[in-house]
Each structure stands twice: as structure tokens, then as C-alpha cells.
């Protein structure tokens, strides 16, 4: 195999390698992964003879086989529908409640002294 044959083989390997890598890279969903639940998928790496993990891009739709749907964010499927089970936030704090509004107390009216009747006024003299 001469220099031309070796070059041709290397070009073919580079082309097919880049085509395979194009189907398996972070942020893109290969056609073969349309029905993949969650936000990650695996592609075979012939060089390392192992599976490489990749993630769908932020904003990609995701789902679980239970029927729950969501959106990928940082490699995790954040659900937009609920199964009625615990949520994925891990925060068990109840939602804040509003403090009941207090009624304003009306100021007490000062009582005016009773006017003495004429009879009472005469008795004091």
C-alpha cells in the first residue's frame, strides 16, 4: 500500500469517525434516541471499546416511561407534569402562607362626663 492508499484509508477513517461522533455529542439528539427517556444517552466508542455518556441540550424535551414529561436542564429531566409522587427538588418545606391581616382597632372614644341633672346640682349647694 503506497502513500496514496494510506492517505485514502486515513481520510476514510477520519470521515467515518467524524460522522459517528456527530451522532453522539452533547446537546444533540440522534434520531436513534428519539424514544430515550431522561436526558442522557450512550454511544459506543470503538477507540476505547466502551460506552460514552452524552447529554441532551438544555431545553430539549424529555420524558419518562411513566408518562411524565419535562425539559432537560444540565443533564437532568425537570418534570413539567406530576405523577402525584414526591417531586425532584428534595425540598420538603411547605409553601409560605400569608400572615392573616389584622383588623385595625378603632380608638376608644373618651366618654364625656354626664351632665348632672338640675336636681343633683341643687343638692350640692
Swiss-Prot record:
CDD domains: TSLPI_Salp14_NTD. Residues 101-119 have a biased composition (Basic residues). Its main location: secreted. It holds the Pfam family TSGP1. Protects mice from FeCl(3)-induced thrombosis. Residues 81-125 are annotated as: Disordered. It comes from the Eukaryota. Belongs to the salp14 family. GO terms for cellular component: extracellular region. Saliva (at protein level). Salivary protein that promotes host fibrinolysis via accelerating host plasmin generation from plasminogen (PLG) initiated by tPA/tissue-type plasminogen activator (PLAT). Does not affect urokinase (PLAU)-mediated fibrinolysis in the host. Enhances amidolytic activity of host coagulation factor Xa (F10). This is Ixonnexin. Keywords: Fibrinolytic toxin, Glycoprotein, Hemostasis impairing toxin, Secreted, Signal, Toxin. Homodimer. Interacts with host PLG. Interacts with host PLAT. InterPro entries: Ixonnexin-like. It is found in: Secreted. Residues 1-21 form the signal peptide. GO terms for molecular function: toxin activity. Glycans are attached at residue 26.
